[in-house]
Structures are given as structure tokens and as C-alpha cells.
Amino acid sequence: MDWLLLAKAAIMGIVEGLTEFFPISSTGHLIVVGDLINFDDRIGNVFEVVIQLGAILAVCWEYRARLWQVAIDLPTSTMARKFVLNLLIAFLPAAIVGVLLIKTIKSYLFNPVAVACALVVGGLVILWAERRECTARVHRIDDMSHLDALKVGLAQIASLIPGTSRSGSTIIGGMLFGLDRRVATEFSFFLAIPIMFAATAYDVLKHWELFTAADLPTFGTGFLFAFLSAFVAVRGLIRFVASHTFNVFAWYRIVFGLIILGSWWLGWINWAS
């Protein structure tokens, strides 16, 4: 058994779990950290699918009571049907654009330099959004209209650019469109479920032949650490947004992005391709 590979898998799982739901871009961090620790490119695409599944199942577990109640009430409750329809409406824009452009995006933007630029720009957008005086008008997820959901879904399109952050685009977009901080954050969590399951299913079908029994320990390690770290991150973020802004994440993005760009410019790394 390759213990070094398992250690790298654990690191990648932790990175995925901690960054998937914080507005700092999980894809961007996986690209950068994967390059730094020289993670096995042979299983890279498949491994990312596995750890994303671990992260999203952590959300399902955290909100299992709410999800179960919605499933039970769906045939009879207008509110439950509205909630599901809002998720579908918010899911579709990024899903459609993603299907059309994913090959182009992966060809040109899946590199650490592009990620660094997106990190910096995204950080500046968060700082700008936090400084705007915007009165929240939606204080419960159940009060969101279909138009609110569509606006969040359109904001999610930006997350197709690696380094932007799916959670960042949906949370900040939701706040700009009138959702309060907690509602925007929780709706982002729920919206992650269909978008990430769809992405996972697509990648599984595309890379099915790369799943081998020999790699199960690596996959299992990454999955476990992604699940546990995502569970901690989701709970922590909900408590955090109750009394804090997202400025700390914005500054982290900016500093991290500038470090990457500076390292590349000085020739310390060769990550442009």
C-alpha cells in the first residue's frame, strides 16, 4: 500500500471539504494543491469526483431532516413543491451553460494562473458587495420567489470559471439580490446538492473505465476526509455568518491569488499550462 499516496489523498479530501462551501473556490484550491503535492494525474479526474461526492453527502447528512420532510410533503405541500422548483430553477442556468462550454473552460482555464486571477477578482467583488448598503427582504428560504431563485442561478454561472467559487457566486449573488446572509448561505448549500450530483454523475459516466479496485483505498481515504471536513465546514459557516461578514474570505482570496501570480511571475513555478 502506498502510504504517501494515501496521505496526499487525505490532504486533497480535506482541501475539498473545507473549500467547497466556503467562498474561496474548491476547484481552484484542488488545482493548486494538487500541483504542489504532485498528486497522481492518472486518477486525478476520477478522484475529484469521489471527494466531491463526499462533500455533498455531508450537506445531505447535515440537512437530512429538512430534506426528508420535503420529500414526504412533496405530494401534498405547496411550500415543499415551491422549494424543489426553486432549486430546479436555480440549477438549470449553470447546468445548461456548463454542458455547452465545459470542454472550452477545461482546455483554457484549468490552470493555477487563471485560478489566481479569478481568486483576486472574486475577492474584490466580495469586498464590494459587503460594502454596498443592501437591505435584505427575504429572511426565510420558504419566502424566496421563483425570480429570486433564477437570479441566484444566473449568478452561479460565474462559478464555471475555476477560482470563482460556486458557493461564493451564489451566496454573494443572493445577498445582492435581497436574500439575507443566512438564507443566501443555506440556499447555496441546498443548491449544491443537485448541481454537484449532476456533475458527479456526468464525470462518473465519462471516466467509468478509470475506476479500478486497486485505487479503492485512495478513493476511500479522500472520500472520508472530504465528508468529515465538509461536515465541519458547513456547520462552522452557518455559525460564522450569523455575526460576521465575508470580508475575511475576500482578503484570503486576494492574498492567495497574488502569491500564486507572484510565484509564477518570478519563475518559481511553471503553472501557466
Curated annotation (Swiss-Prot):
HAMAP family hit by this protein: Undec_diphosphatase
Compartment(s): Cell inner membrane
User: Highest taxon of the source?
Assistant: Bacteria
Class in the EC hierarchy, top level: hydrolase
Q: How does it sit in the membrane?
A: Multi-pass membrane protein
Q: What other comment is given for this protein?
A: Bacitracin is thought to be involved in the inhibition of peptidoglycan synthesis by sequestering undecaprenyl diphosphate, thereby reducing the pool of lipid carrier available.
Q: Which UniProt keywords apply?
A: Antibiotic resistance, Cell inner membrane, Cell membrane, Cell shape, Cell wall biogenesis/degradation, Hydrolase, Membrane, Peptidoglycan synthesis, Transmembrane, Transmembrane helix
Q: Where are the transmembrane segments?
A: 43-63, 82-102, 109-129, 185-205, 214-234, 249-269
Q: What is its EC number?
A: 3.6.1.27
> MF terms per GO, please?
undecaprenyl-diphosphatase activity
> Which reaction equations make up its catalytic activity?
di-trans,octa-cis-undecaprenyl diphosphate + H2O = di-trans,octa-cis-undecaprenyl phosphate + phosphate + H(+)
- Gene Ontology BP annotations: cell wall organization; peptidoglycan biosynthetic process; regulation of cell shape; response to antibiotic
Similarity field = Belongs to the UppP family.
Q: List the source organism.
A: Laribacter hongkongensis (strain HLHK9)
> What's this protein's name?
Undecaprenyl-diphosphatase
Question: Disulfide bonds, which pairs?
Answer: none
